[in-house]
């Protein structure tokens, strides 16, 4: 985990009786950190920044680091996990299923959450419709972006 002292903090919180969820992109080994739930949010291929807009170096680094199958396996094998994906297009379900098919041990449908991509209520409603249909078809869970619905696309929420 990136934060200095994060393992000690997690241990202290757990020892104090707190339920601890760690959310991560799944690119860094868990290294024995304690938690009740690991919420893994692997980045899909459309998350790679546009090289023309952000520079070739940034785009290349992101693409090289966005998926670490061996790290996803380490989390899945050693922790109670859920896998959360931000979905902007119905066709992404194929990429999601392919990614999940490579995880060992594989998560069950109830451990997979699909969240519509969007930063405003209108796009969330539009995308939420097809994401809900994907969830009905696959048995995956629907995950709303409640913070945007309640507060809008504001920093700190």
Each language-model region and where it sits:
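Conserved AdoMet/S-adenosylmethionine-binding subsite of the radical SAM
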Residues: 1-157
């Amino acid at each position: 985990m990136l934060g200095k002292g994060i393992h000690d903090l997690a241990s202290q919180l757990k020892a104090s009786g707190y339920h601890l969820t760690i959310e991560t992109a799944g690119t860094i080994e868990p290294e024995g950190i304690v938690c009740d739930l690991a919420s893994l949010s692997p980045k899909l291929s459309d998350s790679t920044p546009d090289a023309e807009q952000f520079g070739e170096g940034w785009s290349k680094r992101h693409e090289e680091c966005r998926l670490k199958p061996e790290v996803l396996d380490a989390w899945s094998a050693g922790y109670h996990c859920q896998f959360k994906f931000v979905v902007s297009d119905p066709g992404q379900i194929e990429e999601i299923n392919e990614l999940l098919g490579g995880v060992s041990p594989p998560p069950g449908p109830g451990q997979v959450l699909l969240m519509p991509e969007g930063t405003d209520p209108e796009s969330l409603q539009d995308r939420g419709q097809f994401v809900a249909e994907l969830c009905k078809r696959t048995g995956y869970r629907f995950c709303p972006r409640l913070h945007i619905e309640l507060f809008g696309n504001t920093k700190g929420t």
